[in-house]
Design a protein with these regions (language model features):
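Conserved C-terminal active-site "lid" loop/helix of NAD(P)H-dependent oxidoreductases
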Residues: 227, 263, 289-296, 300-331
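Amphipathic terminal alpha-helices
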Residues: 319-327, 331, 335-353
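Mid/C-terminal beta-alpha module of Rossmann-like enzyme folds, strongest
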Residues: 236-303, 337, 341-344, 351-352
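Conserved Rossmann-fold NAD(P)-dependent oxidoreductase catalytic core, especially the SDR/UDP-sugar
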Residues: 84, 106-164, 185
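N-terminal Rossmann NAD(P)H-binding glycine-rich loop of SDR-like oxidoreductase domains
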Residues: 8-28
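Active-site Tyr-X1-5-Lys
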Residues: 160-185
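Substrate-positioning beta->alpha
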Residues: 167, 171-172, 197-202, 216-238, ...
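NAD(P)H-binding glycine-rich loop region in Rossmannoid oxidoreductase-like domains
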Residues: 55-103, 107, 128-133
């Protein structure tokens, strides 16, 4: 059956995830607008057919003017779908998380409503991080080695974010829940990795230096999702029936221990040996506290801060993706082995490694 061309706006299009969403839409034959700031890099938004929409999510009046002009350029129409992938994962000041992730979401929704541009569906990219460190009491599961693991986080659990980032996303979700006649769907991916991603790339750099650093001695169960699986889920969420107002966890469906990712990186990079260092949590907390404080004084972003401490120290990152399978038809196709292989290949081909 021939696919009908749709109009799609992707905010945060210059970011890691956003650029993949734009590319996928173009490959599917849709009209895609890359929502960017005036200062945003467009390095990975160079595919033929890419249209740009400069949006100031921090200025509601200017944002309305920008949407009004775009609507005129589109012949008085809006977009069929809006994917809100814009967001801040690192900020110098806590308030910036809420200004970008919470208020930016509210400004966009209110501007779309005010300009009569409410889409058929609004896809909000949230995060598993809004739940924080819950379900961290190990439970015995019938596995061949009878090991202790944790139970997955469920949609019915109460979010208890342990990071400022997670709290800002939680508040954005809470705002969406107050809207009326606004067809939104929330996607909560676990850790997203893939080509062009910079945080997990730091692990690859560490492996290249023959060092793997881990923290905490209590067992850790981790989940991942390759960027293409997330993008596929986003496009499924656009047309899935009866999912308005609902939220879904997304991962590759597998559970990994704390060494699996680094072991695969070492394997794909061909490094003969790596020194695995494991430090206590109190040591990491001290390092993150000092680093975050000093960086704040200097007005610079820090890779290590208290948010990063809570992320690295969290033991349970499992989540239940069965609702996404059932309602969206989501099925992950990128297990960690395949995803890491593709990521390392890209890093090497593009001179990152």
């Amino acid at each position: 059956m021939e696919q009908i061309m749709k109009r799609i706006l992707v905010t945060g299009a210059s970011g890691f995830i956003g650029s993949f969403i734009v590319s996928e839409g173009l490959q599917r034959g849709h009209q895609v607008w890359a929502g960017v700031r005036g200062s945003s890099s467009r390095k990975y938004l160079n595919e033929p057919g890419t249209q740009f929409a400069e949006l100031d999510l921090g200025n509601p009046d200017k944002l309305r003017q920008q949407l009004r002009q775009l609507k005129e350029e589109m012949g008085g129409q809006g977009w069929d779908y809006v994917v809100h992938a814009a967001g801040a994962t690192k900020c110098i000041k806590k308030e910036q998380f809420f200004k970008t992730n919470t208020e930016g979401t509210r400004h966009l929704v209110e501007a779309l409503q005010a300009e009569d541009m409410v889409p058929q569906r609004f896809i909000f990219i949230s995060s598993l991080s809004i739940f924080g460190a819950i379900r961290e009491q190990p439970v015995r599961k019938a596995t061949p080695d009878n090991r202790w693991i944790y139970s997955p986080i469920l949609l019915t659990d109460t979010p208890q974010p342990n990071t400022v980032y997670g709290e800002s996303k939680k508040q954005a979700e809470a705002y969406l829940a107050t809207t009326k006649d606004f067809p939104y769907v929330i996607l909560r991916p676990t850790g997203v990795y893939g080509p062009r991603e910079k945080d997990y790339f730091l692990m690859a750099q560490s492996i290249k230096q023959h060092t793997d650093f881990a923290v905490g001695y209590k067992p850790q169960e981790i989940t991942f999702i390759y960027v293409q699986d997330l993008v596929d889920a986003i496009y499924l969420a656009m047309d899935a029936p009866g999912v308005e107002g609902k939220a879904y966890f997304l991962s590759d469906g597998e559970i990994y221990d704390s060494r699996r990712f680094s072991d695969l990186l070492q394997q794909e990079m061909g490094d003969p040996w790596v020194l695995h260092i494991k430090a206590p949590l109190w040591f990491l907390r001290a390092i993150c506290a000092v680093s975050g404080t000093v960086s704040g004084w200097m007005g610079k972003l820090s890779t290590l801060n208290l948010d990063k401490y809570h992320i690295l120290s969290q033991r349970n990152w499992q989540c239940d993706i069965e609702p996404a399978r059932r309602d969206l038809g989501y099925e992950p196709h990128w297990p960690l082995e395949r995803g890491v292989k593709a990521s390392v290949k890209w890093y090497k081909e593009n001179g990152w490694l």
